[in-house]
Regions:
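Polytopic alpha-helical membrane-helix bundles and their juxtamembrane interface segments
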Residues: 2-246
Length: 246
């Protein structure tokens, strides 16, 4: 109970330090989040829920572009996430969608790691080589890509956790840790959903698991959009000042 109380106090302390413009963004994100959760509960098949989710992910890209204009890796990672969602939500090219998600996770890895370019290149070649060798030798490509995605996500969780331990008072470091923990919770639900659909375990809880995917996923992207390793750009500061004056 004490840990929960401490966590809530930490969240409240974070909220008090959010500039006015960020509170406007936060309110927008919360409205979208609460609305699509209510729609999923009351009318699970309504297409408007998917549209709201899609718009919410796109807003994360816009937010990062405005606030952290100089952090190109974060912006690209969020845009690739949005692109992957576009492919997975609106098309049947699931393998392509997972492939784009792998690139998104790799961009997050790039922005968090301290590896040299040489070691980073070796890492990328080894991981990619193992993945495509598995697919070429008879494995199913989407499963190989899923394995690559899982390795990159776990690496990002580890890097975010290390950053959080180093910089516990840094709001952005905490956002990164919260974001990637929620991300992995989301993907555990995705994995469980596919296991249920394949008939390996009972599908009795399938609607709940499918619901939880977005309960975890959407806030993960909001937190990650606030986890830049860069300082707020001059462009973002100028926007915040103009909003505060008005």
């Amino acid at each position: 109970m004490l840990k929960i109380t401490k966590l809530v106090r930490s969240w409240w302390a974070d909220f008090k330090h959010i500039p006015k413009i960020d509170r406007v963004w936060l309110s927008t994100w919360l409205i979208i989040y609460i609305t699509f959760i209510m729609l999923d509960v009351l009318t699970p098949t309504f297409w408007g829920s998917s549209l709201l989710k899609y718009a919410g992910i796109f807003l994360c890209v816009i937010y990062a572009y405005k606030k952290y204009y100089d952090d190109s890796k974060l912006i690209i990672a969020l845009f690739l996430t949005f692109l992957a969602d576009t492919i997975l939500v609106w098309t049947h090219y699931y393998t392509v969608g997972v492939f784009v998600f792998c690139f998104a996770q790799f961009m997050h890895f790039l922005r968090q790691t301290t590896l040299s370019k040489r070691n980073l290149g070796i890492f990328a070649l080894v991981i990619s080589g193992l993945t495509f060798y598995n697919a070429w030798s008879g494995g199913v490509l989407i499963y190989s890509l899923g394995g690559l995605y899982a390795m990159l996500l776990i690496a990002n969780v580890v890097l975010a956790s290390r950053r959080y331990k180093r910089e516990q008072k840094d709001f952005k470091a905490r956002c990164g840790w919260y974001g990637f923990m929620l991300f992995i919770a989301c993907d555990l639900c995705v994995g469980l959903r596919y296991i249920m659909l394949d008939g390996l375990i009972s599908a009795r809880s399938l609607p709940l698991v499918a619901f939880l995917v977005w309960v975890f996923y959407y806030p993960s992207q909001v937190f990650i959009a606030n986890s830049s390793t860069h300082k707020e750009s001059a462009k973002g500061r100028n926007i915040a000042k103009s909003k505060a004056i008005s």
